[in-house]
């Protein structure tokens, strides 16, 4: 606890000493010198049983002669920087303590001596002199607490000057007491906290405690100490409270104390359970204020102070991680313990591949010299060859510093790499932090970089030649530069071809859909593919005064939605046992669950993939969420209903299982959970009409989303609106802020990926990344992007996997989607709207031709690409069988929906409703 600068009284004349025995001040110094002072708590100085002398404090100083907390002030003149020590001996006004401060340049040493004699004479010896008879030396280092830590550099010790440290946080300490009632023990603890100047807040229930913690975190006023009444589990479940606090964001270093009955200390299982739940220390109940005060003092020094220091280390780790220089830390056996982000880029490896690796695995050079020098506490400085993953070695200047954390032998080695000037090009091509603003050097990093985007960032008059001379090392810049160099030394024909290539590279949307040529004699396929892959802008945006077909203001009806009986129906359970099989009968599940396939299948998938534990949520919350999501799928839709959602979710689960079995690019638990959630909600509240229809009818959703990705944006938005709108179904409520943000981003991205207008773009990117014959090495530059591509392709294939299902399921899905398209065409005719798919007329449409075109132009390439990645040959097998069947129907003249139903009766609940 610092105090304001003080002023010394005028110094006595040269050779004159004051009545306190002070040494004379230099005559060149001003009479009034600005001084810094440290307040010393009297609790640090134990009173002696023997009498001492009474010394009077300065008459005009700031010393305290009254009060129990302070024994006075020690004044230090920063101008005292002589080579030898000058001493200011000041008394505290107490009979038992003398405080001496020695100023040696910028180093200050403070000692406290206690008088042990009873002669009544004052001890005046310094730390460098001989003690007078009747006195003994007693040097006590001042262990300052955070609130006492001086902020001026003059109070740093010699070790701090050699190895500068970051001061720990220095806020006013706050304590939260969780007691079900304010009894005598609670009052004693409160008084002890107040004695040590802690700001105390008392709450009386778990809910009130958690609410207080959340509010304090929101206002950046966290509690440093939480004391929980653990004497009776009937009143407060201390174990549950402690565990909940530990899982609350921002409280992993909060000190938690449990007040227990004395009898608990005879039962180690009770105390161990509390400690395992996150309690730092268990203390026995007592109403003795002195005992509470001493116990609290120990906690402040032995737990809270170290926790503050530990929290400060995060600043150092963050600084290390963001350094452009490469930093490695190993143990004494040369096993890598830490690597920063620059190391990841240098070695072309992920951090989890680097940590715990032997250092010899990344160096080509012999490391014996380093080991020998570091054993003798000598630094190493030399050139070593670093082995990058899948690339040749690079000679680099390396400095190695041994550090002895415990004892005198080195426990860690710090490696610092300097990249030689000739090897700097590799660092510029690697991705930089995402948070870098667009237009900065760090933002120029993706393969889809468009040269023209530079113009929007203030370089409008920069030519391409000048651009390539800048230190912008994006891959597209290198490609253009290399092609320009090749063009200078090639024939005229080759130069013209390169010009065309350069022109394509300068365009936006390198992966934009390129429609394959469709036979002009196949108008149905033309209509279908055109409607799926073309944006709504090609249609007229005719205004209509008709009401929107989208329901608005629908409320969350949790209680009325969940089926009355959701017991373990043996038929349902037997069917769900095969829920990960590609032959799973989703239509049978639709029938036996009475139109609730998503609820039952969703709960089964959540259990199989441990989603409850991943989201840290109760099963009933997930059940309620699935029920609400399913209720917002419209039963009036023949295709885009909850059965389709359940089918996509089932396919997603099957794909995740296959990825796990192959141990290739395995998704983590959170990615699996978000993929299943996205699949379940990817078409929620679908109106049974296409985005083009909504745009043509001037629907409110089309206006809201500017005619762009209308339905998919609505599905993603309504998913989070429903989820966050009711705490009873909020499956994300126990996630921390960063995890929720990441999960939300993944779910939205996967739902938007189901939009067919970007089908070829996603497919082309996926093939360009995963289409190589050679196995792909892990690369931290692209792992995140490839994971995104993989998740997008996963849900895309799951969404349109109907032609790759067993034939009876494929035909039923074709019947349902055709019926939905027919209903849209009927409404377009009735409302005099542009006909999006004119050939989808129920009287004239050829279902086989539409499916043949869909497989040829959409499904075939995507299924082959996905199957080669995931290794599920049944996808191709079923697709070929179904394609042959549709060809056969077409040759037989089986075209209309009625004819198809006669050949292949509908299956599932929808069949019974016809």
Curated annotation (Swiss-Prot):
Tissue: Expressed in Malpighian tubules and head.
Positions of region (Disordered): 1-27, 113-138
Entry cofactors: a divalent metal cation
Residues covered by the PAS domain: 312-359
Keyword Hydrolase among record annotations: yes
Keywords carried by this UniProt record: cAMP, Hydrolase, Metal-binding
Pathway, per record: Purine metabolism; 3',5'-cyclic AMP degradation; AMP from 3',5'-cyclic AMP: step 1/1
Protein's organism: Drosophila melanogaster (Fruit fly)
Enzyme Commission number(s) from the entry: 3.1.4.53
Gene: Pde8
Binding sites annotated in the UniProt record for a divalent metal cation 2: 683
Family of the protein in this entry: Belongs to the cyclic nucleotide phosphodiesterase family. PDE8 subfamily.
Coiled coil: none
InterPro entries membership: HD/PDEase_dom, PAS, PAS-like_dom_sf, PDEase, PDEase_catalytic_dom, PDEase_catalytic_dom_sf
Reactions catalysed, as given in the entry: 3',5'-cyclic AMP + H2O = AMP + H(+)
Protein name: High affinity cAMP-specific and IBMX-insensitive 3',5'-cyclic phosphodiesterase 8
Active site location: 640 (proton donor)
Binding site for a divalent metal cation 1: 644, 682-683, 799
């Amino acid at each position: 606890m610092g105090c304001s600068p003080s002023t010394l009284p005028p110094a006595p004349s040269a050779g004159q000493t004051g009545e306190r025995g002070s040494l004379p001040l230099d005559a060149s110094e001003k009479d009034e010198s600005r001084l810094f002072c440290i307040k010393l708590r009297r609790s640090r100085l134990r009173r002696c049983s023997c009498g001492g002398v009474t010394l009077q404090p300065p008459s005009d100083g700031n010393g305290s002669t009254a009060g129990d907390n302070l024994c006075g002030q020690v004044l230090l003149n920063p101008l005292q920087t002589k080579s030898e020590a000058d001493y200011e001996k000041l008394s505290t006004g107490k009979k038992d303590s003398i405080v001496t401060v020695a100023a040696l340049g910028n180093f200050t040493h403070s000692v406290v001596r206690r008088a042990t004699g009873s002669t009544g004479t004052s001890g005046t010896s310094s730390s460098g002199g001989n003690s007078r008879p009747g006195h003994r030396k007693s040097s006590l280092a001042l262990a300052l607490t955070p609130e006492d830590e001086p902020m001026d550099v003059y109070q740093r010790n010699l070790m701090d000057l050699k190895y500068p440290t970051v001061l720990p946080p220095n806020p006013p300490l706050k304590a939260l007491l969780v007691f079900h009632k304010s009894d005598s023990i609670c009052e004693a603890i409160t008084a002890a906290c107040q004695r040590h100047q802690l700001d105390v807040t008392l709450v009386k229930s778990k809910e009130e405690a958690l609410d207080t913690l959340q509010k304090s975190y929101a206002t950046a006023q966290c509690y440093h100490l939480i004391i929980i009444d653990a004497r009776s589990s009937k009143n407060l479940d201390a174990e549950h409270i402690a565990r909940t606090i530990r899982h609350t964001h921002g409280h992993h270093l909060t000190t938690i104390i449990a007040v227990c009955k004395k009898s608990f200390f005879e039962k180690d299982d009770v105390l161990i359970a509390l400690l395992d739940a996150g309690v730092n220390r268990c203390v026995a109940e007592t109403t003795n204020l002195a005992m509470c005060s001493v116990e609290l003092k120990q906690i402040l020094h032995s737990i809270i102070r170290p926790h503050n220091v530990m929290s400060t280390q995060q600043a150092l780790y963050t600084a290390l991680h963001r350094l452009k220089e490469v930093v490695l830390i190993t143990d004494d056996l040369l096993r890598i313990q830490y690597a920063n982000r620059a190391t990841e880029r240098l070695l072309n490896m992920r951090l989890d591949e680097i940590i715990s690796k032997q250092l010899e695995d990344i160096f080509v050079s012999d490391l014996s010299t380093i080991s020998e020098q570091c054993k003798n506490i000598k630094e190493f400085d030399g050139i070593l060859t670093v082995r990058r993953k899948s690339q040749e070695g690079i000679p680099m200047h390396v400095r190695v510093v041994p550090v002895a954390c415990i004892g005198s032998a080195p426990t860690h080695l710090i490696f610092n790499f300097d990249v030689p000037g000739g090897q700097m090009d590799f660092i510029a091509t690697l991705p930089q932090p995402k948070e870098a603003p667009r237009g900065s050097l760090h933002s120029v990093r993706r393969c889809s970089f468009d040269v023209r985007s530079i113009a929007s960032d203030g370089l409008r008059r920069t030519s391409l030649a000048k651009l390539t001379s800048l230190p912008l090392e994006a891959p597209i810049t290198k490609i253009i530069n290399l092609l320009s160099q090749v063009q200078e030394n090639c024939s005229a024909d080759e130069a013209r071809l390169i010009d065309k290539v350069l022109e394509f590279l300068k365009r936006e949307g390198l992966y934009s859909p390129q429609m394959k040529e469709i036979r002009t004699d196949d108008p149905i396929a033309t209509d279908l593919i055109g409607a799926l892959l073309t944006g709504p802008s090609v249609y007229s945006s005719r205004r209509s005064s008709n009401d929107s077909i989208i329901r608005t203001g629908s409320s969350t009806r949790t209680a009325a939605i969940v089926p009355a009986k959701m017991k373990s129906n043996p038929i349902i359970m037997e069917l769900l046992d095969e829920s990960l099989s590609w032959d799973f009968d989703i239509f049978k599940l639709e029938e036996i669950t009475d139109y609730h396939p998503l609820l039952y299948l969703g709960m089964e998938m959540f259990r199989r993939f441990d989603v409850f534990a991943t989201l840290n949520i109760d099963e009933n919350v997930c059940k309620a969420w699935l029920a609400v999501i399913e209720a917002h799928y419209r039963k009036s839709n023949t295709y885009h209903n909850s059965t389709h959602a359940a089918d996509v979710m089932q396919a997603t689960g099957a794909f995740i299982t296959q990825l796990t079995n192959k141990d290739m690019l395995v998704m983590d638990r959170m990615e699996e959970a978000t993929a299943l959630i996205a699949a379940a909600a990817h078409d929620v509240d679908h109106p049974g009409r296409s985005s083009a229809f909504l745009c043509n009818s001037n629907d409110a959703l089309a206006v809201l989303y500017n005619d762009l990705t209308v339905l998919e944006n609505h599905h993603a938005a309504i998913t989070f609106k429903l989820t966050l709108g009711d705490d009873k179904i909020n499956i994300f409520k126990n996630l921390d802020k960063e995890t929720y943000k990441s999960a939300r981003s993944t779910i939205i991205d996967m739902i938007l990926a189901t939009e067919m207008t970007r089908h070829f773009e996603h497919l082309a990117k996926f093939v360009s990344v995963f289409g190589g014959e050679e196995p792909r090495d892990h690369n931290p530059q692209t792992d995140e992007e490839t994971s995104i591509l993989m998740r997008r392709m996963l849900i895309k294939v799951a969404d349109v996997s109907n032609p790759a299902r067993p034939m009876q399921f494929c035909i039923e899905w074709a019947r349902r989607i055709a019926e939905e398209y027919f209903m849209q065409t009927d409404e377009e005719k009735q409302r005099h709207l542009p006909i999006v798919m004119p050939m989808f007329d129920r009287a004239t449409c050829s279902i086989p031709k539409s499916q043949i075109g869909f497989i040829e132009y959409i499904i075939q390439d995507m299924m082959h690409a996905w199957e080669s990645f995931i290794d599920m040959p049944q996808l191709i097998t079923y697709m070929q069988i179904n394609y042959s069947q549709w060809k056969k129907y077409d040759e037989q003249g089986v075209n209309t929906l009625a004819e198809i139903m006669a050949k292949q009766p509908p299956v599932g609940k929808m069949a019974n409703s016809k």
